[in-house]
């Protein structure tokens, strides 16, 4: 599975921890930036990710900002993107199973590293159910 990761300055530290953690697990996360804690604009980071997802350069992505809110709003303004803030195990599973989310979002200043890893592991290993009702609803999102 080809996975991208990106963060603004508020999520930079968490992004670096995740890259290191998953590298040790044999899971490669392609870093789309930012590359420092210097202030940057989360919409630009989100758009870099959404462009790559829509071009099918990656199967899924991780976006991180301080709260997860701003970067998720920016990503979800793009047709074809379904970015979900993951905050518990059930949400991590259902957002893939029912919504076929293609980007997991986290609040780097709001969530613990252990929780982020737990939720992303569920997200990345859960398949979309492909049930008609879910396909229909996803189709309605992109009208």
Report residues per predicted region.
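C-terminal binding/interaction regions
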Residues: 4-6, 10-11, 89-143
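A short beta-strand-loop structural module common to alpha/beta enzyme folds
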Residues: 28-39
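Glycine-rich phosphate/diphosphate-binding loop of Rossmann-like nucleotide-binding domains
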Residues: 5-23
């Amino acid at each position: 599975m080809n996975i991208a990761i990106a963060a603004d300055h508020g999520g930079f530290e968490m992004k670096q921890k995740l890259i290191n953690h998953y590298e040790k697990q044999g899971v490669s996360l392609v870093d789309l930036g930012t590359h420092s804690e210097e202030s940057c604009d989360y919409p630009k980071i989100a758009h870099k990710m959404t462009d790559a997802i829509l071009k099918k350069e990656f199967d899924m992505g991780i976006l991180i900002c301080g709260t997860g809110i701003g970067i998720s709003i920016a990503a979800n303004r793009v047709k074809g993107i379904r970015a979900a803030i993951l905050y518990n195990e059930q949400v991590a599973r259902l957002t893939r199973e029912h919504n076929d989310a293609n980007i997991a979002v986290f609040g780097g200043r709001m969530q613990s590293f252990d929780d982020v890893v737990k939720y992303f592991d569920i997200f990345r290993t859960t398949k979309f159910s492909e049930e008609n009702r879910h396909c229909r609803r996803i189709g309605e999102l992109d009208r």
